[in-house]
Amino acid sequence: MKKNSSVVFFLVGLSQFVTMAFLIIGSITAPIFKQIGYSKYDEITYGTFGYCKEGSCSKASYNYHPDELSDSDSNWKLNSNARSILGKIIFITPIAAGLNFLGFLCTIMSVLLINVLSSDRVGSASAIMFFVNLTFSTLGFLSASLICIVVFLLFYPHVTWCSWVLIPGAALSLLVIPLIFSAYSRSSGSRDDDETEELEEKGMLLNDPYLSSKSGRFDIDADSEANLRGDSRTNLLGDNFKNGTNITVVPDIISHNQDPKLSNITTSTTSDISTFDKEAKDMENSNGSGLNEEEDDGMAYDKRRSTSTYSVIESESGLKNGSVSNNYVRNNGSNTSNNINYKVPLGKTEISSSASLASSDYSQREVIPHRNPSRLLNDIMETSFNEPNDSHINSMSSYNDKDSTLTSISQRGVNPEVYNQMPRETAAGPANIRPYAGQPHPAPLVYPQQRLQPQQQQPQQQYHQYNLYQRTTPAGPDPSNVILQSNPYFNVAPNQVPQHRNPVPGVGFAPNPLPNQSPITQGYKPAYKRRMQNKNLPRATTSLNNPYGFR
């Protein structure tokens, strides 16, 4: 509670107490104290509840008929009938004193509640005490004014000092009413001011927490020197900044080891404007060369593939205690800032997938660029032939081709070793072939018996992810070799053609090749096989023991 509010409450209480005291003096007149009374005439002392005459007093009564004690009405202001009516009202003097006393108690209780109770609970209590105090004070004023008027009309012109003190009592009771409004209104304002002061002490106000200290305010400089790579920032951390104030500062999101070409990327929390469109425009303006639109799109597309996700939490400026640094592009230290047509090799872009020290709920996700559909197919074709890291892809492709158990037969040629090991027919042809005589199929050819050796099981490779199932050594001859030896349609001798053929080949068997036609070993070759052939690498089928490269 502020000092001015306390002064007003003090004036209210003092006025109520003085009014109560004056009314109490009027209440204890004769016959209680025979020396004092409202009026003295003809040795008769008139009081509130009786009178005293020549040392003897009457019994206390609320109406002792003061109009009958005098023989003549000429000595009084009013006649006997009026004085008889007023004599019945004079007993309200102690009631007026009691009402002012209750108002005085309400004032004291209001002061105590405002000082003791907390600010969130004192509001309702103060409102209740205001209405109660106002009610008692109003009734006390009315009763004090009434008794003052009655006494003067009844005993005038023979009044004593006890009658005169009723006038200031009534006046003070009238003054109490506006003082009550002022006191409670100031107390409500003082509570708001106290809450404001508490908030100012805690530093929770944002408008002007330091009213008297100019050096304690925030030092905001819009044109400060904290400009990092073209990004103007606000100097929120001045020399006079208080330690108790919390403020959020946006960290420097541009990493120190970032590629210079990526410095134009704008980091924003909204996705209204595509940052990749800005990126392409900035590169076009910075290069100043006459690149056409198609080359510009290709350059932007290649650049988009080299970007990776940035995390503020895992950046070097996000944490002070050694968070994982996020590298945008790792290209083995090659300088690509001047080469605008540089393409990032596939598989070389590394993205940190480890969680940050602050939280493990965040995951690294690759940035999904806006790709140009018109350039996508051309980029794939150029990548397949002009990939910078061909050695790595060739080694992986050859390894997968050799050790894979699921490979299309149409993409493999005939194994030369197995082809050379197959028996050849003589010029005369086989001796046991019979002419075609209505047989559905010609008789099987008889070749010299060749001892079939079961294939040796390949040693288990180092990487078990390519072995889809465990292979077992067949118990008998290979069915494919038996079919090749017993069916004349699989006679692949270069100079010998079977003498008799079935005009309509059987279902599931391919016709024999022409006499002068060599075995077809060429077919569709993917890009990685063409690179293998250019580098004189042997095929994977040359190390196997069957024509189709089965294992």
From Swiss-Prot:
Subcellular location: Vacuole membrane; Cell membrane
Ranges of Low complexity composition bias in the record: 321-341
Domain of life: Eukaryota
Topological region Cytoplasmic: 1-7, 110-135, 182-551
PTM sites of type Phosphoserine: S224, S232, S363
Transmembrane recorded as keyword: yes
InterPro entries: pH-response_reg_palI/RIM9, SUR7/Rim9-like_fungi
Full protein name: Uncharacterized membrane protein TOS7
Organism expressing this protein natively: Saccharomyces cerevisiae (strain ATCC 204508 / S288c)
Gene symbol of the encoding locus: TOS7
